[in-house]
Curated annotation (Swiss-Prot):
Name of the protein: S-adenosylmethionine:tRNA ribosyltransferase-isomerase
Alphabetized Gene3D superfamilies for the sequence: QueA-like
EC number per UniProt: 2.4.99.17
A Gene Ontology BP annotation from the UniProt entry: queuosine biosynthetic process
Gene behind the chain: queA
Any one annotated GO CC term: cytoplasm
Compartment annotation: Cytoplasm
Amino acid sequence: MDVNEFDFNLPESLIAQTPLQDRTASRLLTLNKHTGEIKHTNFKSIIDYLNTGDTLVLNDTKVMPARLFGVKEDTGAKIEMLMLTEHDNGWEVLIKPAKRVTIGTRISFGEGKIVAICVEELDQGGRIMQLNYEGILQERLDELGLMPLPPYIKETLEDQSRYQTVYARATGSAAAPTAGLHFTESLLEDIKAKGINIAYITLHVGLGTFRPVSVDDVESHKMHSEYYEMSEETAKLLNDTRDSGNRIITVGTTSTRTLETIADDSGHFTAQSGWTDIFIYPGYSFKAVDAMITNFHLPKSTLVMLVSSLATKEFIMNAYNEAVNEKYRFFSFGDAMFIY
């Protein structure tokens, strides 16, 4: 399967640079994968598409303010570091400019409040860094770090909390699970009041989010591993939903990938944690997910491929072209799509 089959023309003016004042004010494109019907509405109306007994699955990961600007201790050269994932031997990071950082390089942030030492070189600007810091790392990041906004967002984010979901709890992501940005606490309460269950999983969004597909053949692409967790409570709720014949609806590609990683062939779950590099593209047979809320993604990205596998590639690409014609807002701060 050729990567170019997932390409589409996107005017730069449709890439949302700032979040809307009201999280629920986004537009919503609904796609009925059974009838082929497409409708245009607003995100507040998502509740009308959810049925009593359905379970909505949210990713409660929290974005770290993990973008740091420092200097090399020996030369004073400026370095940008994006922290991604904690490993046994240090933190996996992205470095700019990577050529300045080799094994043994020391980088100082905040006049030594954090010192990072390179212990391993990875490809594409990746490094493993050991961190030395005063006190608690999260406090130092809150003091020195910035939100790691995607490269297509050029404007400064005035309110850092707008790149977090209102239910973010488990710190560890390098990017927000953006489909969840549309929800407010009030909307979630209204959803629960209708008899719809809310379940939480955790998947820490990592390096794969920042890596484009660099191969021509879709099947040759290798996903980066990301850490996930599912609790006993969530596993039971999802199993009860499955056994009662109700729908499991994921909010975002991260929740989708987590559920499809954990589900057995019967679509049931067990509590667990681990690392997933699952790559979902057309031809994949879903075990667990019946419907999904998601944003509009980058051309030729693994996320467009995942979305195309829940419906059909032709249906999704037609919907994307319609969204462009209707001037929907794209990417992290953009509008949403519901595939059911």
